[in-house]
Amino acid sequence: MTISTNTTLGKIAVLGFGNPVREDDGVGIYVIEKLKEKLGEPENISIFDMGTAAFEILFKLQGHPRIILIDAVLNSGEAVGTIFKLPASEIDAQIQDDPMVFLHSLKWDQALSYAKKMLGDDYPENIEVYLIAIDDIRFNVGMTDAAMKGGDKVVNLLLEELEVH
């Protein structure tokens, strides 16, 4: 299956997910904004604000041998701002072959499962996930200081990991 023939994409794609009007749920978007602020548009890195459009991940995977996903994790049992880093292979979301599955309500982990099925051999092997612990997703623009500090830590980790200073 071929979705994109864009050869100008960076080798690394960084995708941030979240909803900035659901308080700390916007932390993935916050990280993306900070990365764009610090990096601009580097040649080898594509930075995407995915918002809540998880199924769009399918269109961002191709052409990027390395993918980094950033999102919030609710009710992790850890303090707000705690960072978890894991390979996407450790996250196995169940997918349904039901044609009535509402694509707009998919989460990115489910979208990854669909992408793996649809892309087959074109599915990137190197997908890392950064999750930032949160405990509040009420309707409110802005984030708590603890979530913001967690987001800042992820930005710094990514700048180191991507060897960008």
Where are these regions (language model features)?
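N-terminal catalytic or cofactor-binding beta/alpha core of small enzyme domains
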Residues: 1-125, 129-134, 141-152, 159-165
